[in-house]
Amino acid sequence: MILLSYLLTYLLCALTCSARAIHNGRSLIPRAGSLEQVTDFGDNPSNVKMYIYVPTNLASNPGIIVAIHYCTGTAQAYYQGSPYAQLAETHGFIVIYPESPYEGTCWDVSSQATLTHNGGGNSNSIANMVTWTTKQYNADSSKVFVTGTSSGAMMTNVMAATYPNLFAAGVAYAGVPAGCFLSTADQPDAWNSTCAQGQSITTPEHWASIAEAMYPDYSGSRPKMQIYHGNVDTTLYPQNYEETCKQWAGVFGYNYDAPESTESNTPEANWSRTTWGPNLQGILAGGVGHNIQIHGDEDMKWFGFTN
């Protein structure tokens, strides 16, 4: 009887502890099919919140998409307002939704910390989310992607520059070049009117050097980039489309002034797609302002989930 009582007590404790781990330690076992917060994904120097969507039909060795919200946005808002969770159910990948810690919820794309590999800023926290998710779900490290809108697009370019080792591709919707919002006062979450208004204009080579300086010892492959922008954007002026495409053309060694092709009315009427090479496309949306539509099906093609 004593042995039986001991075993029952042990089993009850094990079940209780397991339930407590699931309840309190969402970082251990996030539920599939819903947006879940992960509270312990490792070092989080800038207090960015992590939310994750694990599909109900999770693939073996799944891919990962990091989907980064806009100013005033949240992980919940981007989860609801973007197509990535629905697409995850179709393709079996995991979606990470970071959430900015700042009032107004813009991202820090301005401090030296965030613009430096392992520098301790927002980019560092997001990179650690990727590392945790890859390990937790045995994800395919060659199928990790990043995308975002507005401030999230700025961070997309920053992530591609600071952690090129983590990402295979990125899609930026209405952003600016990596480093364009640099704060001379080293202020996180700073606004840069000169950049926003399209007045930060330089050469592809100079833009490339800014991106490459964010991880100066890196010599490996870099994520291919697709850049979307509205041609009547009055928040982040359309010149930022040109400058962002210049930056990645410089990084990949493409001649910015001699693209391989330009297609009209694609992916929809009055939009144009310019291709500089296999690693860089730009899509300029005619008549579209800052509120640019996410093209999830096009993203799936760029990320290699569909043909």
Curated annotation (Swiss-Prot):
The name this protein goes by in its record: Acetylxylan esterase A
Signal peptide: 1-19
Reaction(s) catalysed (UniProt annotation): Deacetylation of xylans and xylo-oligosaccharides
Function as written in the Swiss-Prot or TrEMBL entry: Acetylxylan esterase involved in the hydrolysis of xylan, a major structural heterogeneous polysaccharide found in plant biomass representing the second most abundant polysaccharide in the biosphere, after cellulose. Degrades acetylated xylans by cleaving acetyl side groups from the hetero-xylan backbone. Displays the greatest hydrolytic activity toward alpha-naphthylacetate (C2), lower activity toward alpha-naphthylpropionate (C3) and no detectable activity toward acyl-chain substrates containing four or more carbon atoms.
Coiled-coil zones: none
Pfam annotation, one family: Esterase_PHB
List of glycosylated residues: 192, 270
Compartment(s) of residence: Secreted
Superkingdom of the source species: Eukaryota
Family the entry assigns: Belongs to the carbohydrate esterase 1 (CE1) family. AxeA subfamily.
Source organism (scientific name): Aspergillus oryzae (strain ATCC 42149 / RIB 40)
Any one Gene Ontology BP term: xylan catabolic process
Activity versus pH, per record: Optimum pH is 6.0. The enzyme is stable between pH 6.0 and 7.0.
Key words of the record: Carbohydrate metabolism, Cellulose degradation, Glycoprotein, Hydrolase, Polysaccharide degradation, Secreted, Serine esterase, Signal
GO cellular component annotations of the record: extracellular region
Metabolic or biological pathway: Glycan degradation; xylan degradation
